[in-house]
Structures are given as structure tokens and as C-alpha cells.
């Protein structure tokens, strides 16, 4: 089955965040060129419809992503074994292959050179960052085993962990945390993985990050903490998770130390 859009459509472009609190970008609007986009914003706005954790069959960043991209479906999303003719796949870059989860072609590219696994694109995104952003867990697992560096930051300090958290890909978040990445890494927007997980209303991802020690006091450049965002956006389940975590921390501090 042939791709319905040119390969270039898979290349994402940076979107400038809203500069004023009262006028954030609306993730539901269409771009000027007519393609659907999602735009990062750590400013509270009208809550989006409550979504469950991302389905394993869907691999595109959720609202709150730091990326602007077309919503081209990959072969895995369509449920097809092949999404393009071999000649078309051969024309894709290593970053596009990682984003689409085209493992066979990705492996062929990596065999061509030792330095390709951490090769950045024009925005500093590595294949691992792309795969993490699109929820391609098998690709993420393969790249980590191949030697991909999960600590690399893109030009605007975007990280694989932050983008995986943005999409609510809890399993990928877990894989990255096993590699001792900075759980509180911040990007150009002052956003941390926890802030992006809250912004996307990803309950399980928030739970996983808190369980691993994510900092609840960190503020984005907008001035909002994770709890502030949850309250402002009306994300009650996320708010409850944060409150329960705070209660556990408080209770643990009240437990007297064991006598020697």
C-alpha cells in the first residue's frame, strides 16, 4: 500500500509557543496549510475531552506536544504490514524510519555506519527522540540496545523522555528511566516530563514519573506547577494522583526512625 502523503510530510517543524497567558495556541485548530497539528502549551486552556491512556495501536504525540506535525498514519496504525513501496521506504531518512517504526529498513541504515544511531537531524532530534515522540516502543527498545544515547538533548533541549511523556507513552518512559536519564530535565519552555504528562492528562504516566521521584515543585516558564496545571485544566484524576502522592510523602515523613 502506497503512502498517501509525501515522505516530507513526516518531517516535523518547531512551533513557537503562545506568548500570552490569555491567548494560547488552540491544539484543535488546523494549520494554515490545512494539516492537523498539535502545539505545545503549558498554559492552561479549555480542557480537552478526557482521553484514556494512549492505545498501543496509535503512535502520534498527544495535545501538548512540543512538535508540530502532520497526522500521517504509519503502517502500524493502519494495521497493514507494508505502508509504502520499497522504493519509497528507501527514500526515507533514518529519522523518518524511526518515527514510523520501520524496523527492517532502520536496521539496514544503521549497518551503514557506526555513528548513525545518534545522528541528529536539523533540529537536533535523534532517531531515538523521534521514536519516543511517536510511541514506537519496539523501535525505542531496539535503538537503546543498539547503543542510542537517551541523554541527548535537541537544540531546544527537547529530550526523548519529555516527548514520550508528552504522548503518555508510559512503557517508553519506563525504558528511558531505566537508563538513568534526568527525570526533571527541562526544555526551552521550562517544561519537564511530569509537566507534559499532566498537560496531556496522562494519568498512568504521571503515576510512573511520581513513583520515580519527579519533582512536583518545578514550574514551567508560564509559572504553573504540575498541580497548578491539573487544577486549572480540570483534570481531576491527575489531581487526585498528585494529592495521593503528596499525602504519602507527608505520611512517610511522620513515621519515626527505627531505634538503634
Curated annotation (Swiss-Prot):
Cytoplasm keyword on record: yes
GO molecular function, one term: DNA binding
Region (Disordered): 1-79
Keyword Ligase: no
GO cellular component: cytosol; intercellular bridge; nucleoplasm; nucleus; RNA polymerase II transcription regulator complex
UniProt cross-references to SMART domains, sorted A to Z: ANK
Tissue expression from the record: Ubiquitous.
Keywords of the record: Activator, ANK repeat, Cytoplasm, Disease variant, DNA-binding, Nucleus, Repeat, SCID, Transcription, Transcription regulation
Gene Ontology BP annotations: positive regulation of MHC class II biosynthetic process; positive regulation of transcription by RNA polymerase II; Ras protein signal transduction
Gene3D superfamilies assigned: Ankyrin repeat-containing domain
Ranges annotated as biased composition (Polar residues): 57-77
Post-translational events: Phosphorylated by RAF1.
Subcellular compartments: Cytoplasm; Nucleus
InterPro entries membership: Ankyrin_rpt (IPR002110), Ankyrin_rpt-contain_sf (IPR036770), DNA-bd_RFXANK (IPR017362)
Ranges of compositional bias, category Acidic residues: 22-33
One Pfam family hit: Ank_2
Disease: MHC class II deficiency 2: An autosomal recessive disorder characterized by immunodeficiency and recurrent bacterial, viral, fungal and parasitic infections in early infancy. Additional manifestations include failure to thrive, chronic diarrhea, and autoimmune features and allergies that may be present in some patients. Death often occurs in infancy or early childhood.
PANTHER family: ANKYRIN REPEAT FAMILY A, DNA-BINDING PROTEIN RFXANK
Record's subunit section: Forms homodimers. The RFX heterotetrameric complex consists of 2 molecules of RFX5 and one each of RFXAP and RFX-B/RFXANK; with each subunit representing a separate complementation group. Interacts (via ankyrin repeats) with RFX5 (via PxLPxI/L motif); the interaction is direct. RFX forms cooperative DNA binding complexes with X2BP and CBF/NF-Y. RFX associates with CIITA to form an active transcriptional complex. Interacts with RAF1. Interacts (via ankyrin repeats) with RFX7 (via PxLPxI/L motif).
Domain notes: Interacts with RAF1 via its C-terminal ankyrin repeat domain. The same domain also mediates its homodimerization. The third ankyrin repeat is required for association with the two other RFX subunits; RFX5 and RFXAP. The three central ANK repeats mediate binding to the PxLPxI/L motif of RFX5.
Role description: Activates transcription from class II MHC promoters. Activation requires the activity of the MHC class II transactivator/CIITA. May regulate other genes in the cell. RFX binds the X1 box of MHC-II promoters. May also potentiate the activation of RAF1. Isoform 2 is not involved in the positive regulation of MHC class II genes.
Protein name: DNA-binding protein RFXANK
Recorded name of the encoding gene: RFXANK
Amino acid at each position: 500500500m502506497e503512502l498517501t502523503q509525501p515522505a516530507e510530510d513526516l518531517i516535523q517543524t518547531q512551533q513557537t509557543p503562545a506568548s500570552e497567558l490569555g491567548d494560547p495556541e488552540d491544539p484543535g485548530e488546523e494549520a494554515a496549510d490545512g494539516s492537523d497539528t498539535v502545539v505545545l502549551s503549558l498554559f492552561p486552556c479549555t480542557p480537552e475531552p478526557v482521553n484514556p491512556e494512549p492505545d498501543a495501536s496509535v503512535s502520534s504525540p498527544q495535545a501538548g506536544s512540543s512538535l508540530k506535525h502532520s497526522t500521517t498514519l504509519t503502517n502500524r496504525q493502519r494495521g497493514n504490514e507494508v505502508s509504502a513501496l520499497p522504493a519509497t521506504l528507501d527514500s526515507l531518512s533514518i529519522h523518518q524510519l524511526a518515527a514510523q517504526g520501520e524496523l527492517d529498513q532502520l536496521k539496514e541504515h544503521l549497518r551503514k555506519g557506526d555513528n548513525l544511531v545518534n545522528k541528529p537531524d536539523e533540529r537536533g532530534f535523534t532517531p531515538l527522540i523521534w521514536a519516543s515522540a511517536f510511541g514506537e516502543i519496539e523501535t525505542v527498545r531496539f535503538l537503546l540496545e543498539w547503543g542510542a544515547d537517551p541523554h541527548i538533548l535537541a537544540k531546544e533541549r527537547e529530550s526523548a523522555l519529555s516527548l514520550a511523556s508528552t504522548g503518555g507513552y508510559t512503557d517508553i518512559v519506563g525504558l528511558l528511566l531505566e537508563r538513568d536519564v534526568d527525570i526533571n530535565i527541562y526544555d526551552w519552555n521550562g517544561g519537564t516530563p511530569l509537566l507534559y504528562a499532566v498537560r496531556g492528562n496522562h494519568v498512568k504516566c504521571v503515576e510512573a514519573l511520581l513513583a520515580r521521584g519527579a519533582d512536583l515543585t518545578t514550574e514551567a516558564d508560564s509559572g504553573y506547577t504540575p498541580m497548578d496545571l491539573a487544577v486549572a485544566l480540570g483534570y481531576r484524576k491527575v489531581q487526585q494522583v498528585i494529592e495521593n502522592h503528596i499525602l504519602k510523602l507527608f505520611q512517610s515523613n511522620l513515621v519515626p526512625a527505627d531505634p538503634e
